[in-house]
Amino acid sequence: MSLNVSRLLLPSRVRHSYTGKMGAVFIFVGALTVLFGAIAYGEVTAAAATGDAAAVQEAAVSAILGLIILLGINLGLVAATLGGDTAASLSTLAAKASRMGDGDLDVELETRREDEIGDLYAAFDEMRQSVRTSLEDAKNAREDAEQAQKRAEEINTELQAEAERFGEVMDRCADGDFTQRLDAETDNEAMQSIEGSFNEMMDGIEALVGRIERFADAVSEDAEAVRANAESVMEASEDVNRAVQNISDAAGDQTETVQQIALEMDDVSATTEEVAASADDIAKTARQAAETGEAGRETAETAITEMNEVESRTEQAVASMEELNEDVREIGEVSEMIADIAEQTNILALNASIEAARADGNSEGFAVVADEVKALAEETKAATEEIDDLIGTVQDRTQTTVDDIRETSDQVSEGVETVEDTVDALERIVDSVERTNDGIQEINQSTDAQADAAQKATTMVEDMAATSEQTASDAETAAETTETQAESVKEVFDLIDGLSEQADSLSETLSRTDTEEASAADLDDQPTLAAGDD
């Protein structure tokens, strides 16, 4: 009712302001009171002008009654305008606000008031709509969080299982089975990156280990070939030694014979037949010495050829071991790459720990994954250190083998020089024996004219004695040279034995690893290719 009155009495602009409405009502009441007072005053004045006291009294009473009635009307207007349903509206709004505080957001907040009370209703309605929207957003966010938590738990479980699989494969690789490969069963980019890097690394290690095995086999085969050639050289040296000994013995016999001839040359005339016979014996001995010297020279030349072959084989072995050393260095680089992967895995574990800390109460899965990845990194680092130790051992053995082979090459070169010296000595011996043989032949031919050429024969015998002494000295020198050569060959044998032992040790070290090539070789029963076939 009051709203209808105010709508009728007040303009729209005033109705929208509670303060304006109050001012308008007070102005209207004041104006109405002044108007009624003026009317009452006019009636009282008119009655007084007539001089009728009763009329004045009646006019005064009427004015007072009118004022009382006007006061009631004014109070009613003020109550209807200012009070109206304000208290009821505020009480209703308070009740509805209390229901909203209890969680009832379906409360109707509608009013026909157009003043501040109506604005207050509208503000509460907007607040209710905002709270309802916020609650819906919070509900959706909670559902999204629950789904994200569920997905995170699934990812944690998947990563944990994947990490366990990776750990098993890496353990088998660390035990020497280089045929194992990672096969990621997850879409996680970090795990796929680890899979690709690890598989690429294992391919490189497997190829290098295969090459090292082939090189070790080639070194072992070359060592056997060198040993066989060295045995041939040893046998040839023994033949040369025997030949030189025979030459030395023959030269000694020849020297004694020549000295005996020199002592008996004073009685040349009486002993012409004896000289002829002795000359025949000396000629025979000289021919034998010449033949023996020629055979020794041929044997020495054969020894030189075989020593040159030994030297060539040794140089090939040195080249093979240097290539082996280069391959071992490449394994060292792969080992450094493993260490980098281990470092990256540690970083992944740190990231997982950080994500676990961010996830608050839901961090158990992340923590487990972080621990698993960290353990995986530590195992990878341990495998890397073991591979580094193996590489260091192989490098030390390879360097020792290269040094031994080079020393063997030096010994072989010295042996070749020794044999060449022996050949030169034998050639001098042969020349001396040939000259001795020529002299003896001349003595034999001049036996009929011995009396006339006694002095000449004496001179020739003296020359022959000097030549025989030189021959004996050369033969002794050749014998010493041959003994030195034999010692050099024995040293070569010792070096070859050391090389064979080191090659066997390297093969035994590599046999602890499994590769695809080794598995194929076991299945097909095919021989291992030598390093030169690569």
UniProtKB/Swiss-Prot annotation:
Q: Name one GO cellular component term.
A: plasma membrane
Where are stretches of biased composition, namely Polar residues? 502-512
Residue numbers on the Cytoplasmic membrane side: 1-22, 82-534
Q: Which residues lie on this side of the membrane: Extracellular?
A: 44-59
Q: Which residues cross the membrane?
A: 23-43, 60-81
Report the main location listed first in the record. Answer: membrane
Q: Where is the Methyl-accepting transducer domain?
A: 229-465
Cellular localization per UniProt:
Cell membrane
- Residue ranges annotated as compositionally biased, kind Acidic residues, are 516-525
Instruction: Name the domain of life.
Output: Archaea
Which InterPro entries did the record assign? Chemotax_Me-accpt_rcpt, HAMP_dom, Htr2, MCPsignal_dom
Q: What membrane topology does the UniProt entry give?
A: Multi-pass membrane protein
Q: Where is the composition biased (Low complexity)?
A: 463-487
Q: Which GO terms describe its molecular function?
A: identical protein binding; photoreceptor activity; transmembrane signaling receptor activity
What CDD domains does the database record attribute to this sequence?
A: HAMP (cd06225), MCP_signal (cd11386)
Q: Where are the stretches annotated Disordered?
A: 463-534
Keywords on record: Cell membrane, Chemotaxis, Chromophore, Membrane, Methylation, Photoreceptor protein, Receptor, Repeat, Sensory transduction, Transducer, Transmembrane, Transmembrane helix
A single Pfam family it belongs to is: HAMP
Under PANTHER family, the record lists: LYSOZYME-LIKE PROTEIN-RELATED, METHYL-ACCEPTING CHEMOTAXIS PROTEIN MCPB
Function noted in UniProt:
Transduces signals from the phototaxis receptor sensory rhodopsin II (SR-II) to the flagellar motor. Responds to light changes through the variation of the level of methylation. Also acts as a chemotransducer.
Q: Which family does it belong to?
A: Belongs to the methyl-accepting chemotaxis (MCP) protein family.
Q: What is this protein called?
A: Sensory rhodopsin II transducer
What is the organism of origin for this protein? Natronomonas pharaonis (Natronobacterium pharaonis)
Name the lineage: Archaea, Methanobacteriati, Methanobacteriota, Stenosarchaea group, Halobacteria
State which gene encodes it.
htr2
